[in-house]
Amino acid sequence: MEVRQAINSDYAKTLDTDGLRKAFLVDQVFERDALKLTYSHIDRIIVGGVMPVARAVEVPSSLGKSIGVSYLLERRELGAINIGGDGWVDVDGTRHTVRNEEAIYIGQGTQAIAFGSDDAARPAKFYLNCAPAHTSYPTRTISLAQASPQTLGDPATSNRRTIYKFIVPEVLPTCQLSMGMTKLEPGSLWNTMPCHTHERRMEVYFYFNVADDAAVFHMMGEPNETRHILVHNEQAVISPSWSIHSGVGTRAYTFIWGMVGENQVFGDMDHIAVRDLR
């Protein structure tokens, strides 16, 4: 598991392209038949992915030792969204089907977790967010139809999109983790513009459905000190609470957002007018 230290805003604005990418970009989320994780000191979130192809992939109990516990979810909760083929997740001996564009929430205290695919020719790809937790809530799967949808934007501003809120208080209880998926309509390129920050939560964006010859320019930094990170398919960007988080693609794309922090109020944002950005 790779560890990333927290970076403050004064230091971040001194970084060059390579420095920004090393600090905030997770450039490989999936690896065949492996669990890949990145641990951020920012609100102690763990992000990563698992792609079971030839075999099921278990979360090793030894992983807990790297965070000072006996097993990963002894003091944590986990959310996963499947962006690949249909698959399943075994949670303490109970198998849960998780199809494409479906999610699963796994509560604190779960000891045995394994991920699998229904078809090795079209493997599941489970994108994961894991956060500290203080109590245990039930494991549950969430389909796209069960997610809370919100359509925003306009074709005239190239930002027509639908936000599917999978792991949010109006759908199911969690300690602090929130996750969802935003799908841009064809011809729309911008996400989250006008942009915002939220001092009370950090966020991670995971971009996918990005064409091989396309890219997304992810905007970050303080509103008066903006920077960008060029992102390709199936890459993630860690966004501290002091940073804006927005993006524009050369084509439409989809991304998963995950938040942890003080609260779970989706609308608790500090909005920034486009004219005030620098």
Curated annotation (Swiss-Prot):
Cited InterPro entries: KduI, KduI/IolB_isomerase, KduI_N, RmlC-like_jellyroll, RmlC_Cupin_sf
Cofactor: Zn(2+)
Record carries keyword Metal-binding: yes
Catalytic reactions of this protein: 5-dehydro-4-deoxy-D-glucuronate = 3-deoxy-D-glycero-2,5-hexodiulosonate
Cofactor: binding details: Binds 1 zinc ion per subunit.
Cysteine disulfide links: none
Single GO MF descriptor: 4-deoxy-L-threo-5-hexosulose-uronate ketol-isomerase activity
Gene3D superfamilies reported in the protein's UniProt record: Jelly Rolls, pectin degrading enzyme 5-keto 4- deoxyuronate isomerase, domain 1
Annotated residues for binding of Zn(2+): H196, H198, E203, H245
Pathway this chain belongs to: Glycan metabolism; pectin degradation; 2-dehydro-3-deoxy-D-gluconate from pectin: step 4/5
Family the UniProt entry places it in: Belongs to the KduI family.
Biological role stated in the UniProt entry: Catalyzes the isomerization of 5-dehydro-4-deoxy-D-glucuronate to 3-deoxy-D-glycero-2,5-hexodiulosonate.
Name of protein: 4-deoxy-L-threo-5-hexosulose-uronate ketol-isomerase
Species assigned in the record: Paraburkholderia phytofirmans (strain DSM 17436 / LMG 22146 / PsJN) (Burkholderia phytofirmans)
Gene encoding the protein: kduI
